Amino acid sequence: MTAELVRGQNHPLPDTRLEIRVSAGHPVLAGATLGDEGGRVPGAEWIAHPGAPSLPGVDVPGAPAADQRLSVDLGAMPGTVHRISVLLALTGHGGAARFGAVAAPFVAVAGPDGTEIATYTITGLDRESAVVALELYRRQGAWKVRAMGQGYEGGLADLLGDQGLERPADAAAAILAAAAPEAAPAAT
């Protein structure tokens, strides 16, 4: 049976191979940060995003889209990783610059056979342009998922700064640049 989570609620993860599905109704950038026991992200190389979509144990989409799929292999996570934060951000391309102007994002965690383990609809967002949707965390050797829904009005830079990343504005700018649509060819 699928657990329908509310903000702050957690649920055990019976599988180590997971697919995280995002339905946002508007193109969003989807990514993940890998953090230590305190949730601190030690450096920009611990962020999976469109410009660097693969890290040990996690693969994220290469471009913003309304429907996203992230692959996670908890068994392949380095031993120093205790938290995986799934993040969503509006890039400002295509109109919407705040989550309050779009439909509430829906996130589902599914096992290797596609069966949903847990779902979460991220409600209550308004002026925020970045949000930690879910957190996968390791406690006493077992992995769980927690519905977060923690939004950031200051966008991706504030989100990354909150996770202890040094120079978060630089990292956010690089991530958003990697997610920007390619410039249209010049007309001749």
Locate predicted features.
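Intrinsic-disorder/low-complexity signal
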Residues: 1-188
